[in-house]
């Protein structure tokens, strides 16, 4: 017999959502930092021809 699952609380839902938002923020920050270092020519980990 099928039993309905318990409802996920709002606080737990927000915690999970914020985790994903924070992860996206740090990834974007890292990408922006890499782009800045490439643009200024200070990159040591990324090689590109100018």
UniProtKB/Swiss-Prot annotation:
* UniProt entry keywords in alphabetical sequence: Chloroplast, Plastid, Ribonucleoprotein, Ribosomal protein
Q: What is this protein called?
A: Large ribosomal subunit protein bL32c
What start-end ranges are recorded for coiled-coil regions in this protein? Answer: none
**Gene (name only):** rpl32
Tell me the protein family, please. Answer: Belongs to the bacterial ribosomal protein bL32 family.
Write out the GO cellular component annotations.
Answer: chloroplast; large ribosomal subunit
Provide the primary localization: plastid
Molecular function GO terms recorded: structural constituent of ribosome
Q: Which domain of life is it from?
A: Eukaryota
Which PANTHER family does the record cross-reference, listed alphabetically? 50S RIBOSOMAL PROTEIN L32, CHLOROPLASTIC, LARGE RIBOSOMAL SUBUNIT PROTEIN BL32C
Biological process annotations from GO:
translation
Transmembrane region positions? Answer: none
């Amino acid at each position: 017999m099928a039993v309905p699952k318990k409802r996920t609380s709002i606080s737990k839902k927000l915690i999970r959502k914020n985790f994903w938002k924070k992860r996206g923020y740090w990834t974007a920050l890292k990408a922006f930092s890499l782009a800045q270092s490439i643009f200024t020519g200070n990159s040591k980990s990324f090689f590109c021809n100018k």
